[in-house]
Amino acid sequence: MIARHVPMKEAKLSSFAGLAKYITNSQEKQERVGEIRLTNFQSESLDWAVTEALHVQQRNQRAEGDKTYHLLISFAPGEKPSAEMLRDVEDRICAAIGFGEHQRVSAVHHDTDNLHIHVAIN
């Protein structure tokens, strides 16, 4: 398993809303997106969770840089952890890098040879 920060280079991904839309969009591929998870939000709706995250970002006057962090967690080809294990891995990694209590949208992707999780962290 490899976890890494993905720099927000593309303009369409440089906002929380853009990244959340990208990672949860099936792009008309039946097997692309698996479980979508919302963590530390009041809402259980993706649209409302994104709105909530954007309001939190607007209130944050201290942060000068990008307020969205894109984390990618990749597994070895052929490795297929259970949904419970994937949630646990995400929770542990986010806690380890100091984002355990932050709002996040995550999506499991099956569109490559290796299973991976994209995590948009506010």
Please annotate each region the language model reported:
Residues M1-N122:
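N-terminal nicking endonuclease/strand-transfer module with a His-rich metal-binding environment
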